[in-house]
């Protein structure tokens, strides 16, 4: 019988009351159960992978493991399977609205790069059943693993009623609800970065950070990476939750590792069940920029290693200079877009070219979006990008 970790470590996983803002109210007992599930590898087929394996709390809820494609995509429970997209951080995911279409007809919100999960609860359950992730065969198998541990039976029945783990549908739904509750705690969304401290008047930007902030709000960054077109929203998430096609090339190393083949096309939003409009092909959700300086590689397929490269990529749309057409990581021209139609040119072409000084400043500002507990990772990230 698979033995699951005891419930004692929960005290170190759940912040003490009042230590951080919560993204939304979460019942302490439910969140505590979710915290235990989050670190439990028994919820994967071979009992080798937990949620925390790919969303390491010590690494801003991203995957620190290297596979055949480096850090670009994650390795599955079997130690061989690879995904085709970069593992997104779960930080601030609870702030993402449910998937919907706004008054202007734009798709917004939802979880994952393609919004295939309506909300955090749906997101929490899907990796367990994904064959290239945790690879559990079905909900009944998940329920059986939960029943293997008496502590889980006690905890689930206290919250969801007697016999909950005997019903696969109820058990799976309850586990997803608990995981979502944990992800809605302040551990994931503390709003304690230097940026937040500056906004609260507790600290000041350096001159370079201040310049970077000015670049950010006056260039076209704000069009997609701020909730409002003007001004700063309280608890800013640095995303408008929309879907855009910015013309990224295929990450050929990741595509090969995934085994999907050279002819595969990642259609993004168009692949979401219920979306049939070809105009949505190639669109991916705008990610939050919180902790961006410590959560590389970048873009939905992890195609860029360096944050500077991710910024410089946008110059290809705003400058005719020869250097703007070259990927500094490869020394070769930027690859062709995987999906060349439906490019968000109105946003991409609205800015001006960023020179080296402005890129330096923008990187400095983006580093201020790092949660306090991840600030030590900044030096590590800077050193890695110099290698």
Curated annotation (Swiss-Prot):
It is an enzyme of class 1 (oxidoreductase). The keyword Oxidoreductase applies. The keyword Cytoplasm does not apply. Keywords: Electron transport, Heme, Iron, Metal-binding, Oxidoreductase, Periplasm, Plasmid, Signal, Transport. Pathway: One-carbon metabolism; methylamine degradation. Gene3D superfamilies: Cytochrome c-like domain. Coiled coil: none annotated. Heme c 2 binds at residues 221, 224-225. GO terms for cellular component: periplasmic space. Pfam families: CCP_MauG (PF03150). GO terms for molecular function: cytochrome-c peroxidase activity; electron transfer activity; heme binding; metal ion binding. Binds 2 heme c groups covalently per subunit. InterPro entries: Cyt_c-like_dom (IPR009056), Cyt_c-like_dom_sf (IPR036909), Cytochrome_c_Peroxidase/MauG (IPR051395), Di-haem_cyt_c_peroxidsae (IPR004852), MauG/Cytc_peroxidase (IPR026259). Its EC number is 1.-.-.-. Its main location: periplasm. Residues 1-20 form the signal peptide. Heme c 1 binds at residues 51, 54-55, 300. It is found in: Periplasm. Disulfide bonds: none annotated. Involved in methylamine metabolism. Essential for the maturation of the beta subunit of MADH, presumably via a step in the biosynthesis of tryptophan tryptophylquinone (TTQ), the cofactor of MADH. This is Methylamine utilization protein MauG.
